Amino acid sequence: MFSTTSIVLWFTILLPVTLPVSIDNRDLLLKRHVEPNDIQFFNQGVRSSLSYIYQKRDVSDSDNEQVLRKSKKKKKTTSTGTPGNENTTDFASAQEFEKWEGDREGWQISAGLYFDKAIASDSCDSDSEDEDEGRKKFWIFTDDAPVDNENLIVSSEDKLELNYISSGKNLEGLTKVIRKAKGNSTTYNQSKIKFNVDAQGEDQFESGFGSLIPYNSFYLYILLFCIIF
């Protein structure tokens, strides 16, 4: 009896350490070097991805590099090989799209995250007129996401944009804007990437079913199970 009780107690104590994150996004979290629903660690992982993007851009051939800048009033396409064009648009803030040599294809996702301008001063060379001078939005690349598949958990307070970057294709017309979700979060279609930008509490984790479960309730169920059995 004593040994059984000890085993149950040790299992309850060690459970938080061995508890898996999410079946769907565990590999993503490990790859980004972040913890679930921790904004600070998440931003660090995203900045790591950003440095990879700009490193690829810096070593690329400038003749094959194309930069599309979006601002409030104008959308300008600049290319070193062909003349650019201008179109009017009503985007809310300045954003950058970049393509480098190697023609990497995939969905480019704006997760609504920002970083300080000082951190990006060495890598961001955009001269767009952004009202918020101290912050700039950047983009995260998915891995091996097909053209017709995208999966995002969209916050009710954010509007995300998906842009497919492909070799020899015009970026215009490929932008898909995901409007605000009616509930707390909404999942769209299928893909490997799942960003939950609506989670703010540290006492929550994302389960394999994509729902948010409070830690307190979860451990209460475990405790009741141990008492009964």
From Swiss-Prot:
**Coiled coil (residue ranges):** none
Keyword annotations from UniProtKB, A to Z: Cell membrane, Glycoprotein, GPI-anchor, Lipoprotein, Membrane, Signal, Virulence
Q: Where in the cell is it found?
A: Cell membrane
Biased composition of type Polar residues is found at 81-92
Q: Where is this region: Disordered?
A: 63-92
Q: Which residues does the record annotate as propeptide?
A: 209-229
Kindly list the residues that the UniProt entry marks as GPI-anchor amidated glycine lipid attachment points: G208
The record's Gene Ontology cellular component field reads: plasma membrane; side of membrane
Where is the signal peptide, in residue numbers?
1-20
Sites carrying sugar chains: N87, N184, N189
How does the protein's chain sit in the membrane according to the entry? Lipid-anchor; GPI-anchor
Q: What turns on expression?
A: Up-regulated upon interaction of cells with host macrophages and upon milbemycins A3 oxim derivative (A3Ox) treatment.
Query: What biological function has been recorded for the protein in this entry?
Result: Predicted GPI-anchored protein which may have a role during host infection.
Write the protein's name: Predicted GPI-anchored protein 19
